[in-house]
Amino acid sequence: MSNGIVIIGSGFAARQLVKNIRKQDASIPLTLIAADSMDEYNKPDLSHVISQGQRADDLTRQTAGEFAEQFNLRLFPHTWVTDIDAEAHVVKSQNNQWQYDKLVLATGASAFVPPVPGRELMLTLNSQQEYRACETQLRDARRVLIVGGGLIGSELAMDFCRAGKMVTLIDNAASILASLMPPEVSSRLQHRLTEMGVHLLLKSQLQGLEKTNSGILATLDRQRSIEVDTVIAATGLRPETALARRAGLTINRGVCVDSYLQTSNADIYALGDCAEINGQVLPFLQPIQLSAMVLAKNLLGNNTPLKLPAMLVKIKTPELPLHLAGETQRQDLRWQINTERQGMVARGVDDADQLRAFVVSEDRMKEAFGLLKTLSM
């Protein structure tokens, strides 16, 4: 490979790929291009920065320069890729262009902001860069509205509450974590958040935001309103697909790839939050780690299909942490819930009494690995 591998992106997926490639080949040319600083940080830490009093710069684990030196890379930080010429094997920015033999899209996903009047007043916490832009506002805010009661929204609600702030969480659904599990399973965490002082506005809709002299007025349905100091959107992520679309690649929710992480173009691959693997978007650390291991082999000519095992998803709510696995969102499962003082084990079984999903909490999380072994895939 004379031009080597070009990777667009510098997040967790890109870094895992670099590490796996370098384990097998120390000299193949590797070029990374990204719009951010390319400094390394642990993205899940963003769910806990407020209660731990961390500044954005405190999150940095390794600078871009250290990363480049350690893994023999060419890095182009603060660089927006504008176009991909798939036929000519060229990646373009406004002032530069790069030839590639193989190209990897690791462009991640962006936070979805609900399209309501005043949406520009909402903050998002999807990167170190975003946190840096609003950390003073978040630290100084006394009244916080979190829009979205999913995984990130629930984590943030607990964190802001632990930091002593007045927290309101709003969601259209009738329970928190509604896209991940049924209400009878999430109710333990929901009750804990309420006990801590989080004001839950479920089955409720944000209709607009307006700046006032003393904060932000949030207008809700049913002629309700509340005033807060800051509003955070935690309503999910959208895979970044614009570049792939311009390159003529097949797009659905994400950039469509097969079991080899290959897109509809033989020399372009996708990895991480931007990728849709055989119809599934999997924005969690473990599938990204496993995908990076497989893709490194494929880029170096050792074709290997990705085979994902049953995997744990961790909800980092320290006052009541949860692990879950399997098809927890399936509507046809019967849930067998065992609740004790030290935690909960909820088993989701199908009509044949096969274990298809489970959720464990607190001290009973240690039972997760045993349950994983009996999970039917």
Curated annotation (Swiss-Prot):
<protein>
    <recommendedName>
        <fullName>Nitric oxide reductase FlRd-NAD(+) reductase</fullName>
        <ecNumber>1.18.1.-</ecNumber>
    </recommendedName>
</protein>
<keyword id="KW-0274">FAD</keyword>
<dbReference type="GO" id="GO:0016731">
    <property type="term" value="F:oxidoreductase activity, acting on iron-sulfur proteins as donors, NAD or NADP as acceptor"/>
</dbReference>
<dbReference type="Pfam" id="PF07992">
    <property type="entry name" value="Pyr_redox_2"/>
</dbReference>
<dbReference type="InterPro" id="IPR023753">
    <property type="entry name" value="FAD/NAD-binding_dom"/>
</dbReference>
<dbReference type="InterPro" id="IPR050260">
    <property type="entry name" value="FAD-bd_OxRdtase"/>
</dbReference>
<dbReference type="InterPro" id="IPR041364">
    <property type="entry name" value="Rbx-bd"/>
</dbReference>
<comment type="pathway">
    <text>Nitrogen metabolism; nitric oxide reduction.</text>
</comment>
<keyword id="KW-0963">Cytoplasm</keyword>
<comment type="similarity">
    <text>Belongs to the FAD-dependent oxidoreductase family.</text>
</comment>
<dbReference type="InterPro" id="IPR023961">
    <property type="entry name" value="NO_rdtase_NorW"/>
</dbReference>
<dbReference type="InterPro" id="IPR036188">
    <property type="entry name" value="FAD/NAD-bd_sf"/>
</dbReference>
<keyword id="KW-0560">Oxidoreductase</keyword>
<keyword id="KW-0520">NAD</keyword>
<comment type="function">
    <text>One of at least two accessory proteins for anaerobic nitric oxide (NO) reductase. Reduces the rubredoxin moiety of NO reductase.</text>
</comment>
<dbReference type="Pfam" id="PF18113">
    <property type="entry name" value="Rbx_binding"/>
</dbReference>
<dbReference type="GO" id="GO:0005737">
    <property type="term" value="C:cytoplasm"/>
</dbReference>
<keyword id="KW-0285">Flavoprotein</keyword>
